[in-house]
């Protein structure tokens, strides 16, 4: 019998639907609006969230019906995760796809959905809804913290 947790013993393709869904740590970073530079293809995160992101829970407020309200919402699938370069470096889907383990604060490891927030990984308290800004000003909200959350601080900074 295998005593390893499923994320250590299965590939993304082998996971059941409930296992797949549980890989989401609830950080909300994938629900931030992003800008793509046309000539280079570079992706830039903004602090502007999808109108459906609940800023406190960092979960979609209409997950099952999100495409009714946000037709271009990107669904993470076993097939497309390897090709989505903008997934944050702490994303459970990205980590498992890269053969890495989940961090201590991931709810599957900690047993507590609040640890992702307590560890400062999530978007909680850092965003503004797209309904509250002029979308023409989106570039004014470019941030790098979604790509640096979870990085070890230098001793001088700590």
Curated annotation (Swiss-Prot):
NCBIfam families: PRK05170.1-5, PRK05170.2-5. Belongs to the UPF0260 family. This is UPF0260 protein RHECIAT_CH0001358.
